[in-house]
Amino acid sequence: MPSPHSLQTLAKKILATQQISTDHYFILKYCGLWWHGAPIMLSTNEDNQLMIKSASFKEGLSLDLALMKVVQENNHDLIKLFTEWGADINSSFVTVNMECTRNLCRELGAKEALNERDILQIFYKTRDIKTSSHVILCHELLSNNPLFQNIERMRSIIYRSLEKLSINFILDDISFSEMLTRHWYGLAILYNLTEAIQYFYEKYKHFKNWRLICGLSFNNLSDLYEIYNLEKVDMNIDEMMYLACSIYDGNYSTIYYCFVLGADINQAMLTSVINHCIGNLFLCIDLGADAFEDSMELAKQKNDNIFISILSFKNYSPDSSLLSLKMTDPEKINALLDEEKYESKNMLMFDAHDEKTSTSPVRL
């Protein structure tokens, strides 16, 4: 038979999922479902993970991150509640700052101390949630947290994630706190979290061109368009195209946008070969790139048989329907060049040729 304590926890959980009239907010206050002057609400995200919402975190936080915040605030009632709802009590040690709160967390089952593996696991879990509230709070709680500063494996993970993006600063010359800040800022752009993007943009204007670099690299054309037209950009269009072509295979919208602005499409073709970006290569050919000899030389230098096969085909031609558009509207470009839907005319031609002539077709 369930204990009265577990029934009370369940009742609060059910109550937090309901739409409650402001006339009945006193019930939520009485039940302890109140945080930062507003009701606590529970919901699930697209991955069926429980999310905590309140006035300060309208888009939602993971249970673990919400626990870290109430531990920082030394809010013992909510520490107990969020733990009862399933938050990992060990994550409390990331933000604990008073001995009485540390003792409570131990009473609730926390370890005596966290090892490197525990800390890494906490960090990995924080990166799964794609809301502005979550990404901003991750930055505020973790970027300058001493617990994360001396974990060599974490430093290596963040370093590698930023390595290709560090085109206008020396990665070895910045602090790990700045690396983490750039990491969260980049995630906001990757997931197109507009509130978080504005937060980082206003707070870290000295991160020169970082928003532009991430928009290009992560195919966020809407944000790229906004920042490119918002301020003077001191990066030439071919540098922008290099980022669009080299970081991720499928950056069709940002490649097209840079092309319309005047970037060298042949150089983009070479960059796509160097970085083994097949989809990007075919889009460059669709847009009129014809640097086939130089591209073949690069493919041979890399012993890249897939690209050698692709570049050996001789019947490619520009896609006149694509070239005739010359548009810069982000919504229209994204609709036309959606990564999941766009079919390159030249890729289709190569696939048909390859299936006819090869006993082992190239898998694209």
From Swiss-Prot:
GO biological process: taxis
Disulfide bridge partners, by residue number: none
Signal peptide: none
Pfam short name (any one): ASFV_360
Recorded family membership: Belongs to the asfivirus MGF 360 family.
The protein's role, per its UniProt record: Plays a role in virus cell tropism, and may be required for efficient virus replication in macrophages.
UniProt protein name: Protein MGF 360-18R
Native species: African swine fever virus (isolate Tick/South Africa/Pretoriuskop Pr4/1996) (ASFV)
